[in-house]
Amino acid sequence: QNALIEALVDSKQKDSFLLGMWALNRDNPYHSYLKVVDAEKLDNKSYHPGGCTPLYDKWVETLSANVTYAQQLRDSGTTVRSIAVVITDGQDYGSRQHTAADCATLAKDLLDSETFVLAMVGLGNHGFKDVAKDMGIPAGAVLEAGDTPSDVRRVFQLVSQSVIRASQAKVNPKSAQNNFFTP
């Protein structure tokens, strides 16, 4: 996560990025949308991996918050493109309000709007590609990675490159769904 923030801060487009950060195993976000230079970097005190992840509930909650904020920006005349990337082991533990089908319905609506890019990174080997498909995330926007520290660093570097490329309009939102992680 820190590598992602650093890459965005170092990009020429840093002033055009807002970053919201949620952990799927927490009730509250680390922070809502801030300029990337103000985004919180994680350390051993602020981030505690593990615990139960209500993946479907948190994905819908996070996307709903993004939709609301993006609409506020649009209403004020700001052009907005939203890129949401979930990094997960693909397991849902404890979702009580939403199912994978609910996620897929929301994903379809957002992708059809052509103002959203949705992507998933799966860490480890837990069948997350099927989960991503069930949640409506296009196959070209799904990345499989190991779960070692070097794998995780590589993933954040690739995510940051993909976000920067998408923000520079080198790919349009529709095609980004099919090749988000392709350089």
Language-model features and meaning:
Residues 1-183:
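Acidic, low-complexity intrinsically disordered regions
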